[in-house]
């Protein structure tokens, strides 16, 4: 009898997965990405076998922000291949906006690096340095949406990585022990694509919020992207206000909680 199209597709997928398994056995140290036509085939049969997953082929930084902010719903942070494609001709805010998308996942750094001047190259280096710091901690951090799950068309997006004590205790007991008696650090990326110039976030009691990208200590790396204002409205709530309300912008913050 004639097999169904679905049965044929299933056998094809299994054959591809068997082939990937053979490659992993032969080359266990090779890192393999699942591009899958811009993440249109990001199923866990493949994600369980491959190291990284491209989250999109989207080239508009404003749209990509929503993809990067929501990817953690289905893909582990350490697998999220989020593109950051700063270009020399971009203004500072746009360059920061696109680089922010990659820092908390796996930064897919694109753009013509060889055409960049010293200032733009310094900004890219800052993003890469922060990304490497995040990578060291990703294994015991989990996705976090302090303003609920992102609205694909929403004016503000917020996505972060935070410690989960129960997971750390089960998988990284040494990390859990450090969390019990010491200050611990979490990360938050915020994009403002339009609308009002401030966002209120419930971050919990004792949250200390500090902008880390672009680095306020290196203002010459992105002089057109001035630091956002951080105000504590009450012990649990922080208000973030953009520096320029006329165009989209993004920032990454480090949030620290000191043990009580």
Residue ranges and their predicted role:
Residues 10-115:
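Glycan-recognition surfaces
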Residues 225-260:
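C-terminal beta-strand-rich structural cap/linker in extracellular carbohydrate-active enzymes
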Residues 2-12:
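Glycine-rich tight-turn/loop motif centered on a GG-T
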Residues 34-36, 113, 189-192, 201-203, ...:
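Active-site proximal loops enriched in glycine and acidic residues that flank catalytic Cys/His/Asp
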Residues 101-106, 110-149:
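Aromatic- and carboxylate-lined catalytic core of secreted/periplasmic carbohydrate-active enzymes
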Residues 204-222:
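Solvent-exposed beta-hairpin/edge-strand motifs
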Residues 150-207, 247-254:
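Carbohydrate-binding surface patches
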Residues 34-43, 117-121, 145-154:
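A glycine-rich phosphate-binding loop feature that marks nucleotide/adenosyl-phosphate handling sites
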């Amino acid at each position: 009898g004639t097999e169904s199209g679905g049965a044929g597709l299933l056998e094809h997928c299994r054959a591809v997965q068997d082939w990937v398994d053979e490659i992993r056995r032969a080359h266990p140290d090779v890192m393999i990405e699942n591009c899958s036509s811009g993440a249109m085939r990001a199923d866990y049969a493949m994600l369980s076998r491959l190291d990284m997953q491209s989250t999109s082929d989207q080239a508009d930084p404003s749209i990509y922000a929503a993809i990067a902010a929501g990817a953690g719903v289905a893909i582990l942070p350490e697998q999220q291949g989020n593109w950051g494609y700063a270009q020399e001709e971009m203004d500072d805010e746009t360059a920061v906006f696109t680089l922010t998308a990659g820092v908390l996942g796996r930064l897919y750094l694109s753009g013509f690096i060889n055409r960049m001047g010293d200032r733009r190259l310094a900004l890219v280096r800052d993003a890469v340095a922060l990304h490497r710091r995040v990578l060291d901690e990703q294994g015991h951090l989990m996705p976090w949406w302090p303003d609920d799950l992102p609205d694909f068309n929403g004016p503000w997006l917020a996505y972060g990585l935070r410690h989960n004590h129960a997971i750390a205790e089960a998988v990284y007991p040494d990390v859990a022990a450090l969390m019990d008696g010491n200050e611990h650090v979490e990360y938050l990326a915020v994009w403002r694509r339009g609308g009002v110039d401030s966002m209120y976030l419930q971050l919990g009691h004792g949250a200390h919020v500090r902008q880390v990208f672009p680095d306020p200590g290196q203002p010459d790396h992105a002089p057109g992207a001035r630091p956002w204002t951080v105000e504590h409205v009450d012990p649990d709530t922080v208000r973030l206000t953009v520096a320029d309300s006329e165009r989209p912008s993004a920032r990454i913050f480090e949030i620290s909680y000191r043990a009580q």
